[in-house]
UniProtKB/Swiss-Prot annotation:
HAMAP family: Pyrrolid_peptidase (MF_00417)
Name listed for the protein in its UniProt record: Pyrrolidone-carboxylate peptidase
Chemical reaction(s) catalysed: Release of an N-terminal pyroglutamyl group from a polypeptide, the second amino acid generally not being Pro
Cellular location(s): Cytoplasm
Similarity comment text for this entry: Belongs to the peptidase C15 family.
Keyword Cytoplasm among UniProt keywords: yes
Length: 215
């Protein structure tokens, strides 16, 4: 089994992004699966091409994209990607789409193929906070989540794909009072646990456990 794991470069006012820092520290093999690590740019109109080229070259069984979610205190496997770009800030190319559809002729939303409940449970059992999330936002994280699902639907039907957000690092919240943070070691531990869950649930689907939310 081969798993492509992507992480974004820094964006906005931050000089570091825990996503790519954690991805770079992952081992090359987890639970018998080969781990291919890829840095992608925080740019709406570029990131998808970088991932598409990597999928075509590596032919992974799974794609797990990792992104930063400042303000969250846990690792959050994402349930659904929506067909919308609505940038809170400009991306790293200076582009800020507002209420743009990603693909005008396609699905309003795609659901992940990853066992997100099993992933969240495995992360917590590793001692790292985690919960399933039902919104990946409308910035480049949701964009790449949707784009990879679109690629799966149109070009790479054999892959399974999804997205997971991770919190700020401690050094990112020095001037952000009361903002949650998680250490890089915990990020790596949590992502590793999530990947182990993906491998263990391959061909079995997700587990049946309560992860729903009222809002």
């Amino acid at each position: 089994m081969k798993i492509l794991v992507t992480g974004f470069d820094p964006f906005g006012d931050d000089k570091i992004n825990p996503a790519i820092e954690a991805v770079k520290r992952l081992p090359d093999e987890i639970a018998g699966a080969q781990i291919v690590k890829l840095e992608i740019p925080t740019k709406f109109n570029v990131s998808a091409d970088v991932v598409k080229d990597a999928i075509a070259k590596e032919k992974p069984d799974y794609v797990l994209s990792i992104g930063q979610a400042g303000g969250r205190f846990e690792l959050t496997p994402e349930r659904v990607a929506i067909n919308l770009d609505d940038g809170r800030i400009q991306d790293n190319a200076g582009y800020q789409p507002l209420n743009h559809t990603i693909h005008g002729d396609d699905e309003n939303a795609y659901f992940t193929q990853l066992p997100i409940k099993a992933m969240a449970k495995a992360i917590r059992e590793a001692g790292v906070p985690s919960a399933v999330s039902n919104t990946a936002g409308t910035y480049v994280c949701n964009h790449i989540f949707y784009q990879v699902q679109y690629m799966r639907d149109k070009m790479f039907p054999d892959i399974k794909a999804g997205f997971m957000h991770i919190p700020f690092l401690p050094e990112q919240v020095v001037t952000r009072p009361e903002t949650p943070a998680l250490s890089l070691d915990d990020d790596v531990l949590g992502i590793t646990a999530a990947i182990k869950a993906i491998v263990s649930r391959d061909g079995k689907g997700d587990i049946e456990t309560i992860e729903g939310k009222d809002h």
